Swiss-Prot record:
Gene3D superfamilies for the chain: 3.40.50.12280
UniProt binding sites for [4Fe-4S] cluster: C77, C78, C142, C172
Pfam families per UniProt: Oxidored_q6
Enzyme Commission number(s) of this protein: 7.1.1.-
SUPFAM superfamilies found in the cross-reference section: HydA/Nqo6-like (SSF56770)
Subunit structure: NDH-1 is composed of 14 different subunits. Subunits NuoB, C, D, E, F, and G constitute the peripheral sector of the complex.
Single annotated GO MF: NADH:ubiquinone reductase (non-electrogenic) activity
Name the UniProt record assigns to this protein: NADH-quinone oxidoreductase subunit B 1
UniProt keyword list: 4Fe-4S, Cell inner membrane, Cell membrane, Iron, Iron-sulfur, Membrane, Metal-binding, NAD, Quinone, Translocase, Transport, Ubiquinone
GO cellular component, one term: plasma membrane
One GO process term, biological-process aspect: aerobic respiration
The organism of origin for this protein: Rhodopseudomonas palustris (strain TIE-1)
């Protein structure tokens, strides 16, 4: 007769996984963020009361910063660097920044490249299809202010003439690290301003 999975042979110890410790900092040997004042306050409140008290706006803001869905509006060479952000080396999804194909499912639009006068109405149309609250990151010199083509008759001298911009990422083209820093700044801005007031 074979023992069932709930029965163990005499003297054998059941296999029990050790508790999760998180990501260990090799310099200190402690979990990353163990000294963070925010987490210390959360742990203190949970150990005192057994539950956590927060305002609804804080909860919505926390959820929104950790689940930003972005769509690309790639117009030129900066879009190649934007694609690199989703590759394994940078992996923007670990920050809760996941790509979407439809503007109706997106919170953030990244405008990357030279915006021409003919493309400006399309940019505005896509922006208007995004649900509120919506954010725009302008990536690269051309999107920020016309860049190399600033004096061309067919170029819009900055996307902020068409849609409101929340974060400007400079560079020609900006690196994936610069764009990732812009994403983190946007998350910080959302935490600071909230979503209900916007």
């Amino acid at each position: 007769m074979q023992p069932t999975p709930s029965q163990h042979p005499v003297g054998a110890q059941p296999l029990i996984a050790r508790p999760a410790t998180g990501i260990i900092d090799p310099n200190t040997g402690r979990p990353v963020g163990a000294d963070d004042p925010f987490f210390l306050n959360v742990n203190r409140e949970l150990s005192d009361k057994g539950f956590f008290v927060a305002a609804t706006d804080d909860l919505i803001t926390w959820a929104r910063t950790g689940s930003l869905m972005w769509m690309t509006f790639g117009l030129a060479c900066c879009a190649v660097e934007m694609m690199q952000l989703s590759m394994p080396r940078y992996d923007a999804e670990r920050f809760g920044f996941a790509p979407r194909a439809s503007p109706r499912q997106s919170d953030v639009m990244i405008v990357a490249g030279t915006l021409t006068n003919k493309m400006a109405p399309a940019l505005r149309k896509v922006y208007d299809q995004m649900p509120e609250p919506r954010y725009v990151i302008s990536m690269g010199s051309c999107a920020n202010g016309g860049g190399y083509y600033h004096y061309s008759y067919s170029v819009v001298r900055g996307c902020d003439r068409i849609v409101p911009i929340d974060i400007y990422v400079p560079g020609c083209p900006p690196t994936a690290e610069a764009l990732l820093y812009g994403v983190m700044l946007l998350q910080k801005k959302i935490r600071r301003t909230g979503t209900i007031e916007r």
